[in-house]
Amino acid sequence: MEITKEKLAYLLFLYNQKDTNCTVTRLAEEFGVSKSTFSRVLNSFYHENLIIQKGKGILSIKGEKLTKSYLKDITEIKSWLKSISNFSDEEAYHEALTLVLVLSNKTRYKLITDLYKKKLFEKIDKVKSISGDMLAINLEDGKYSFAFTIYKINKLEISMANDGFVHPGILEIDNGKGNLILFPKEIEHESLLGNIILKGQVESLKYMIDQEFINSRNVKNNYIIPIDRLQFHYCKEERILQTSIKIKVRADVGIIHMPESCAVLNIIIK
């Protein structure tokens, strides 16, 4: 569905008027267009399932969800623009409205998540660490990429397990709960004889909490580690959050089941 600036302006207007129960005539007057123009827009919205009834300015669940997502991003970008410039409220709003439409979805999402992280870092500016459960409460819902490296236990050497996952990983925050998500990928391993390339992938992942290894949940072949009992350390100078957790990884490479090995998963969020 293509969203133009004009179309989004109508959706935002209807969203703000949702509790007024105004007639189409009154809505058109408030918006500053003729009744016929407003009715044509409503007719278009009805065919796109954005309003619940033909000729009524009441957003459907789909329309409200779409509008709220844009409004949330506009609000964040507006606040950011005001913090870095001398824009008035109205100027910042219109610039933010333009930005959410001209940016690609990927760039827009990255900008918004970066702004969310900026707000988090401002909140924890005077602390050296934050628990995972508090991190999940203070960080807006979303999916945040994180860099990670898996090291051999008690060594500054990168573990073979590091190649068993897609980089970066994802920290997913949803309704005050947070999970680290690791995406396994195909591993290539040269046989001891050196003439055969064996292929496979991570078969199981365990993580240590309170000196006990716990099986990671596997959802759609992705490994999930809850963050609620992890401790994140904050570096103010570099604006990064970092945590480490011991893990056990077992890989299935061809006909060979490689033994379960211990390693350290080091995570950086910036």
Label the predicted regions.
Residues 1-10:
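Short alpha-helical segments that sit at the start of domains
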Residues 46-56:
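A short, conserved structural fragment
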Residues 55-73:
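Basic, amphipathic "hinge/linker" alpha-helix immediately C-terminal to the N-terminal HTH DNA-binding motif
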Residues 19-30:
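Short acidic, hydrophobic short linear motifs in intrinsically disordered regions
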Residues 75-116:
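Amphipathic alpha-helical dimerization/coiled-coil segments
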Residues 132-179, 183-270:
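N-terminal soluble domains immediately following signal/targeting peptides that reside
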Residues 9, 13-17:
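Short amphipathic alpha-helical elements of helix-turn-helix/winged-helix folds
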Residues 27, 37-48:
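Basic amphipathic alpha-helical segments that dock to polyanions
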